[in-house]
Amino acid sequence: MSLPESFALTAEDAKLLLAANVHLGSKNVQVHNEPYVYKTRPDGVNVINIAKTWEKIVLAARIIAAIPNASDVVVCSSRTFGQRAVLKFASHTGATPIAGRFTPGNFTNYITRSFKEPRLVIVTDPRTDAQAIKESSYVNIPVIALSDVDSPSEYVDVAIPCNNKGKHSIGLIWWLLAREVLRLRGIIPDREAEWSVMPDLYFYRDPEEIEQNAAEEARAGATEETEEVVAEAETEWNTETNVEDWADSGVTAAGEEAAASQW
């Protein structure tokens, strides 16, 4: 699929894709994903053609932008690395997120409170989100999936070939997809203009790491406060006092007390 020049992959986006290891696939290849393989490295890792990755991102964005009601798009991620990206994508595009475990019957059992009737489903991994894809096939909902070269392609209508196991790769693909959707909707008016949202916002962050960083910052702040208090105390102790002033003030006070006693 050849894209117009306005939709072509830029050098900056290509650098981002390579930096996030989007092009590094698994060692096994599913037969339907062979056209996306650029070459196989000596260590057995299959390299994905990022030009085809970008073509599928543009195609998926055009499908999403064609749906009038943004909330009719459901984005799913059972994989931990994709849950933050799914929530951010939903907040920027208006889609409906399902982060975490997909409850069976979400698309088929209308009695459940979480029942949904979406017009499009986007999943992070066809393996971990297999339940969502299976239920979508029952009710004829098209599916877009972030697909590695070893991912199953059953009931997947649009597969975006990429590394769907790394946190940076997953976050960047969702970021590029959100940016392209906003461009097609006209929210980002100029394709040359940069989006104010950074890709880092879509990357997974470990809660324990966040707590450790907060604790280290608190310790650093406490250390700085202690050093300031010690420095102030040292300056107070090092200041020289005038003994003559003390003596004069003592004599004056004694004279005033004697005069008051005579009265």
Swiss-Prot record:
Compartments in which it is found: Cytoplasm
GO cellular component: cytosolic small ribosomal subunit
Keyword Chaperone included in the entry's annotation: no
Biased composition (Low complexity): 213-223
Alphabetized Pfam families for the sequence: 40S_SA_C (PF16122), Ribosomal_S2 (PF00318)
Gene3D superfamilies documented for this protein: Glucose-6-phosphate isomerase like protein, domain 1 (3.40.50.10490)
Compositional bias of kind Acidic residues: 224-245
Alphabetic keyword roster: Acetylation, Cytoplasm, Ribonucleoprotein, Ribosomal protein
MF annotations from Gene Ontology: structural constituent of ribosome
UniProt keyword Cytoplasm, yes or no: yes
Region (Disordered): 213-245
CDD domains xref list: RPS2
N-acetylserine PTM positions: 2
GO biological process, one term: ribosomal small subunit assembly
Subunit structure as annotated in this protein's UniProt entry: Component of the small ribosomal subunit. Mature ribosomes consist of a small (40S) and a large (60S) subunit. The 40S subunit contains about 33 different proteins and 1 molecule of RNA (18S). The 60S subunit contains about 49 different proteins and 3 molecules of RNA (25S, 5.8S and 5S). Interacts with RPS21.
Function per UniProt: Required for the assembly and/or stability of the 40S ribosomal subunit. Required for the processing of the 20S rRNA-precursor to mature 18S rRNA in a late step of the maturation of 40S ribosomal subunits.
Family membership: Belongs to the universal ribosomal protein uS2 family.
Matching HAMAP family: Ribosomal_S2_euk
Full protein name: Small ribosomal subunit protein uS2
Source species of the chain: Clavispora lusitaniae (strain ATCC 42720)
Taxonomic classification: Eukaryota, Fungi, Dikarya, Ascomycota, Saccharomycotina
